[in-house]
Structure formats: C-alpha cells, structure tokens
Design a protein with these regions (language model features):
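His/Asp/Glu-rich metal-coordinating catalytic cores
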Residues: 1-172
Length: 173
C-alpha cells in the first residue's frame, strides 16, 4: 500500500494464499496505522510535534488489493515479453512459495530463484517443497543455513502422547 500511495498502479503477482491473506491483513494494518496516527497526533499536538502521517491509509490498502494478481503454484506467468515467473510450493508454511524467474534476452536465458525458508519433507498438513533445478542465480534467506538440523522429532508420537495425557487427566481433545 505504501508504494501504491506514492503512485504505483502496476500488477502485484502473489500466490493465491497470499492474495487472500493480504485482503484481510492490509485492511487490518491500515486500521491500526490510522488509529496509531490519530493517537500520536493527539499527543504530539500538545507537545508541539509535527503531524505523524501513517505509511498508508485504508483507501490505499483497498486500492492496492485490487492490483493483486493471484498466481497458482506451477503456472507460468508472463508479466512482460521475455520474462516468465513460476511460483512453487516452498513447503515451509501454508501458502509459502519460492519464485523461479526466467529472463530471455538476446537469445540467452537466465534462471533466477528467489526463496525464503524451505520446509522439510513429510510434514503434517504441509506439502513437501518443490525443488528447483538449473538456476543460474539463487537469492535466498539463510538464517539457519549454517546448521545441521539432525534427526527430526516424531511429531505423530508427540501428538499421540499429548492426546493420551489429556485423556488420562479427564480432559477433552
């Protein structure tokens, strides 16, 4: 919404899940920002401070939401000639994605992959990550990239234990 408020009116490509979340989240964020601006300005006027302007308004949030283009996983989108984009499941959180960007110019093709966290295999509720191949460049978040994660906990056994303890105490699940 902040770039929309400054005049950007182009399409915003995002996964379908991100589009759904942003519809709710951006309006909520705008509401919070407007409330905070009102509070800060009320307090600031008494102290002679300049007016606080929120990063964006509800109108900006509602406007930018109209520019979102939902992109299903695996579908190749062509936002401009010579450029194709494919969102794939990163398997990290519901709706997370890695992005494969292919650029063709002067008869050459370059593939760039952008990703945040990539999930583990065989997680409950979350699909395994889609692995991308033959990238020329990879731009990636790597907070825990220098660590070996070792053995993965047996989540089913842990959940079963919690359920059994709850029943043993007479609780409800």
């Amino acid at each position: 919404p902040a770039v929309y408020a400054k005049g950007f009116m182009g399409p915003i490509y995002a996964t379908q899940a991100t589009c759904h979340l942003c519809d709710i989240m951006l309006r909520d964020s705008a509401h919070i920002q407007m409330f905070e601006a009102e509070w800060r300005n009320r307090k600031g006027r008494r102290q002679g401070k300049p007016e606080f302007v929120p990063a964006y308004t509800m109108e900006d949030a509602m406007g930018v939401i109209q520019n979102f283009v939902p992109c299903p996983y695996e579908k190749i989108i062509t936002p401009a000639p010579g450029i194709s984009v494919r969102f794939v499941d990163a398997g990290h959180l519901l709706g997370s994605a890695s992005i494969e960007l292919t650029i063709q110019e002067d008869g050459e093709e370059k593939k760039i992959v952008f990703s945040g966290d990539i999930g583990n295999l065989h997680q409950p509720l979350i699909k395994d990550p889609t692995y991308l191949h033959d990238a020329d460049y990879v731009v990636m978040e790597s907070t825990y990239g220098d660590r070996s994660h070792g053995e993965r906990p047996d989540y089913v056994a842990i959940l079963s234990e919690v359920i059994q303890r709850t029943f043993d105490r007479g609780g409800n699940v």
